[in-house]
Design a protein with these regions (language model features):
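N-terminal glycine-rich anion-binding loops that anchor highly charged ligand groups
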Residues: 4-16, 35-51
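Catalytic cores of alpha/beta
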Residues: 161-165, 179, 183, 233-248
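N-terminal amphipathic alpha-helix/helix-capping segment at the start of soluble metabolic enzymes
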Residues: 1-22, 69, 73-74
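Conserved, mostly hydrophobic/aromatic
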Residues: 9, 17, 38, 119, ...
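Active-site beta->alpha loop and helix N-cap motifs at the rims of alpha/beta catalytic domains
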Residues: 45, 50-183, 203-206
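Short, well-ordered coil/turn segments that N-cap beta-strands
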Residues: 4-7, 42-44, 77-82, 113-116, ...
């Protein structure tokens, strides 16, 4: 059966790929060698900045993160949107920053070629991403709200636990349900995010779970939905294919 829609692919090799495999140590010279191939590939987007990149570029490589972004932008020449990953209120650092810092930082990032800012909070606290979504929209880039995926701890409920429940003991209940993730995604949409990503940074979502969750996200959201995962347990590719089958953009 022919596909009636075009799948948009975002490549993460130059940010999350090198961050996950060798601690974000790609030099500018190494990156420059592959940029012509990226321009020819014509991905919808490339995640090339943010996360640990700015810190590592300065701390370990003695290079400028702004030069990194601008050089990639000039080489790609609009063939793909350039993406960065922001920790919301924490930006690319490890402490919360005031709105004045967020405003200036995002403005400079867009001026140096950034097209999409993927924004997340590790606890899915929308209060920590609200300003970032608003400020990215205000400077003309695409705000991408990333909902962090995780799973509930495994609890073994014994017979005695059930007996104690009759006398008031509370049994553990699931927290990270499909409805939880849909609610967080809708929260991003309400804040003004132009797209939403289900971000599975630990590679925990299996194919059967994505087959359940992705249709609910697509049915609930008006904005495009992206899916990001890792292959830590070995089924990242299968989960990605299942996301495609169930309508991921």
């Amino acid at each position: 059966m022919a596909m009636s829609r075009k799948l948009k692919i975002r490549d993460l090799t130059l940010r999350d790929g090198q961050q996950s495999l060798f601690a974000t140590r790609l030099t500018q010279e190494q990156i420059n060698r592959v940029l012509p191939y990226y321009k020819d590939a014509g991905f919808f987007a490339m995640e090339v900045w943010g996360g640990a990149v700015p810190d590592s570029v300065m701390r370990y490589l003695n290079e400028s993160p702004w030069t990194r972004l601008k050089t990639i932008s000039e080489a790609i020449g609009g063939a793909s949107y350039l993406t960065a990953l922001s920790r919301g209120r924490n930006l690319f650092g490890y402490a919360p920053y005031p709105d004045t810092v967020l405003d200036g930082f995002y403005r400079e990032a867009v001026a140096n070629g950034l097209g999409i800012m993927r924004i997340f909070d590790a606890l899915n606290d929308l209060n920590n991403v609200k300003s970032s979504v608003e400020k990215i929209n205000a400077v003309g880039a695409i705000s991408d709200g990333a909902v962090c995926y995780t799973v509930d701890p495994h609890y073994t409920i014994t017979f005695m636990d059930r007996v104690k429940a009759l006398f008031g003991k509370k049994l553990p209940k699931p927290i990270f349900t499909d409805e939880y993730f849909v609610e967080k995604a809708l929260g991003f949409e309400k804040l003004g995010a132009k797209m939403v990503t289900l971000k599975d940074m630990a590679g925990l979502v299996n194919p059967s779970r994505i087959a359940s969750l992705m249709p609910k996200l697509k049915q609930s959201l008006k904005v495009p939905v992206d899916f990001h995962t890792h292959c830590t347990p070995g089924y990242g590719l299968a989960s990605s294919l299942m996301a495609v089958i169930h309508g991921v953009d």
